[in-house]
């Protein structure tokens, strides 16, 4: 099934396209969740333009779920697009885990959760099946733990993501439930999950670093500025942003207008067909918004 190649149903009037939220179930090579959920929000654009839109993958925090991110960003995105911002498709994967609840959006050292592999090898193929985007038309965004996840995944895969947005993210190890394992393998896994290990490739990606002036979370406070200094040392392109809202999706919502203005996309080109991936679309009912991270 090609979701983006034709996944928006034209309404009665071709002049009045409507936004659409669809849930996919995408297979994952892991024990915790062999099938994981992904929500895909397509903005109100003509059906023939959907397959040409850029795609932004949006990662939630912990504890949390896609619901919180959807509740925080869809309304400000729709408003920004209505006022002329370049539209894109927003994708909300579920990065939760069972064995190691604080997943850090990683492949756990024991392989029980394979979230990074799932996101980069399975979700992209499922969501973009009608037109696999280039890195210039694909970005990754995250809040809190999702901000860490967005940053480290972009550093691991600069060939996949041309832009990364971290909102209240952090750039240090915060492995609360031992997703990165125990001795003797922990040291190597921890190094792989440490952003500074990959600082030399950080200049291959554009960075948006957002942090609330009212966020007093010890792990978060000052992380954007500290990472910005490291990015400057390797001549990476980055923007720092400070907004109100504390450590919450209110802050995320406040950042969205800046994010949409900051993003840069490649000129639109005709879609290149690609093999469809294994994804099962379900009813396009909006999930109940969650106020948690």
Whereabouts are the PLM-identified features?
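Non-catalytic cap/lid and distal C-terminal segments of serine-dependent acyl enzymes
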Residues: 1-293
